[in-house]
């Protein structure tokens, strides 16, 4: 039995806001790049129906955490109107910064959904899991999909894209930006929506993030981090922030630029990947291989 599972992060290589729905969700076009850097989740199935979440320091985490919500949603779907047969003790080793634009919470939720779907012997198909994921957050379907991808709609219409191997230097400002707040600021700033374009066109032009100027305007810390990185490379925002990144053809170049940064600038270097390590690990589980998201 496997107990330890990867929960990878992501970057938005470009991000355009193309409209807004009546329910407040925004239409977007983005290129999701999976990265090796990510959290680790240990999951132990129990037979008492309880869902408990602990950090690596063994602190019990609040009940509203997206991991707990994901597990309870799966319970409700698999055992409606009756006591769940299984529960889980979940231990989270969190290294992806919160409110960073690296997708940590969404990735955590996707990992829990996929692993418990197997270990609780629910065996829901990918379409059902994607539906459940979207109920938790707009980025969760991408992590369930498990491939670097072009996304439209509210992020739930996904087309696989092979992204050439790159290394990424990611700067981590000491601020958190919630996705909800970022989109609120977009509306308050009265920004015009970007025109809807084809994937081919977007992949052929310079990449851009519609939130970049807004976030720099309202966060002095992020603006400073942008200035630091922009001296040596093309700096870009991921998601609604707060993290900033630059891409490099080699690991050596990424480390070279990192060495130029001031000591007070927190940063990490990671490699872009096209297939989620979670999906690769689940593929090794015979019972799960028939419903993994590679079709």
Curated annotation (Swiss-Prot):
Pathway where it operates? Isoprenoid biosynthesis; isopentenyl diphosphate biosynthesis via DXP pathway; isopentenyl diphosphate from 1-deoxy-D-xylulose 5-phosphate: step 3/6
Cleaved signal peptide residues: none
Q: Which GO terms describe its molecular function?
A: 4-(cytidine 5'-diphospho)-2-C-methyl-D-erythritol kinase activity; ATP binding
Tell me which EC number(s) this protein carries. Answer: 2.7.1.148
> What catalytic reaction does the record list?
4-CDP-2-C-methyl-D-erythritol + ATP = 4-CDP-2-C-methyl-D-erythritol 2-phosphate + ADP + H(+)
Tell me, which GO biological process terms does this entry list? isopentenyl diphosphate biosynthetic process, methylerythritol 4-phosphate pathway; terpenoid biosynthetic process
Quote the record's binding site residues for ATP. Answer: 97-107
Report the function annotation for this chain: Catalyzes the phosphorylation of the position 2 hydroxy group of 4-diphosphocytidyl-2C-methyl-D-erythritol.
This chain belongs to the protein called 4-diphosphocytidyl-2-C-methyl-D-erythritol kinase
Species classification: Bacteria, Pseudomonadati, Pseudomonadota, Gammaproteobacteria, Enterobacterales
């Amino acid at each position: 039995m496997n107990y330890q599972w990867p929960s990878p992060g992501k970057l938005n290589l470009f991000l355009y806001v193309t409209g807004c729905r009546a329910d407040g969700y925004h239409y977007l076009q983005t290129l999701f790049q999976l990265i090796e850097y990510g959290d680790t989740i240990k999951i132990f199935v129990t037979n008492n129906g309880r869902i408990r979440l602990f950090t690596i320091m063994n602190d019990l985490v609040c009940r509203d955490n997206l991991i707990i919500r994901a597990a309870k949603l799966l319970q409700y779907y698999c055992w409606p109107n009756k006591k769940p047969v299984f529960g889980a003790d979940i231990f989270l080793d969190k290294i992806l910064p919160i409110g960073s634009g690296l997708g940590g919470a969404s990735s955590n939720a996707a990992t829990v959904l996929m692993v418990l779907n197997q270990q609780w012997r629910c065996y829901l198909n990918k379409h059902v899991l994607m539906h459940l994921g979207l109920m938790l957050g707009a980025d969760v379907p991408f992590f369930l999909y498990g491939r670097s991808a072009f996304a439209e709609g509210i992020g739930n219409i996904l087309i696989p894209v092979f992204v050439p191997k790159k290394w990424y230097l990611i700067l981590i400002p000491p601020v958190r930006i919630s996705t909800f707040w970022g989109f609120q600021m977009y509306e308050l700033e009265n920004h015009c929506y970007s025109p809807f374009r084809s994937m081919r066109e977007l992949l052929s032009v310079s990449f851009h993030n519609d939130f970049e100027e807004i976030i720099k305007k309202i966060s002095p810390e992020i603006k400073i981090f942008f200035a630091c990185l922009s001296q040596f490379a093309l700096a870009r925002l991921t998601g609604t922030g707060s993290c900033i990144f630059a891409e490099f053809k080699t690991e050596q170049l990424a480390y070279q630029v990192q060495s130029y940064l001031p000591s007070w600038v927190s940063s990490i270097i990671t490699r872009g990947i096209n297939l989620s390590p979670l999906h690769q690990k689940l593929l090794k589980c015979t019972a799960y291989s028939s419903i993994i998201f590679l079709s």
